[in-house]
Regions:
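Extracytoplasmic ligand-binding site segments that recognize negatively charged/polar headgroups
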Residues: 1-88
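Short secondary-structure boundary segments
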Residues: 7, 32, 96-97, 156-157
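Periplasmic-binding protein-like
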Residues: 62-67, 73, 106-129, 165-167, ...
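Alpha-helix capping/helix-boundary segments
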Residues: 80, 97-99, 149
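A ligand-binding cleft/hinge motif common to bilobed small-molecule-binding domains
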Residues: 85, 90-108
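Mature extracytoplasmic/periplasmic domains
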Residues: 119, 123, 128-174
Length: 175
């Protein structure tokens, strides 16, 4: 998870707590409703971790968003490419790889991952035991977790699950 922001319109945050400051009034949004959207729920979970809470008890994240709302800093607008581009959502809590994509439309868009709120989520991969071609499914899995497959995730802006091992092995593609 990350904090994406338009550096031409708001100061660079150095911590999640910065979003409670007056200069962020009416500018902070989530990518959806946390009761319905995984990215938004993970924004609340990130706030929980940043505020000394946990993933098992996200009440500190809920409290953080109550503070954001009562200060007038949180806006109940679902962040999207369009709202970032038109300036409605100048600060967005979202997956870093999704937020990084906003740079295409807003060159001053920056992405920040707070040190005290590092939170990741990975896609689950499975092979159905009833698959018509289980060997092909296994080969696909093998490819996804190969250096080549992981570098494709990286090219798409995601952080591959094997990135640390690939960095040590020198197999991460150079940008």
């Amino acid at each position: 998870m990350s904090i994406g922001y338009d550096s031409a319109k708001v100061p660079a945050p150095t911590a999640l707590a910065d979003l409670l400051k007056a200069e962020y009034k009416g500018k902070v949004a989530l990518n959806g409703d946390p009761t319905r959207a995984n990215a938004a729920l993970n924004g609340v979970m990130m706030a929980s971790v940043a505020n000394g809470g946990s993933l098992d008890d996200i009440s500190k994240g809920v409290d953080f968003f109550k503070q954001l709302k009562s200060s007038g800093n949180f806006i109940p607008v679902q962040a999207s490419t369009a709202t970032i581009k038109n300036g409605t959502t100048q600060v967005v809590l979202d997956w870093d790889y999704l937020s990084a994509g906003a740079v295409k439309n807003v060159p001053t868009w920056k992405v920040f991952v707070p040190d005290n709120a590092v939170l990741g989520g990975y896609y689950a991969q499975a092979i159905n035991k009833e698959a018509p071609h289980p060997a092909a499914a296994r080969l696909w899995q093998e490819y996804l977790y190969s250096d080549a497959g992981q570098n494709l995730w990286l090219k798409g802006g995601a952080r591959p699950v094997r990135m640390d091992a690939m960095t040590k092995a020198g197999t991460v593609d150079k940008a």
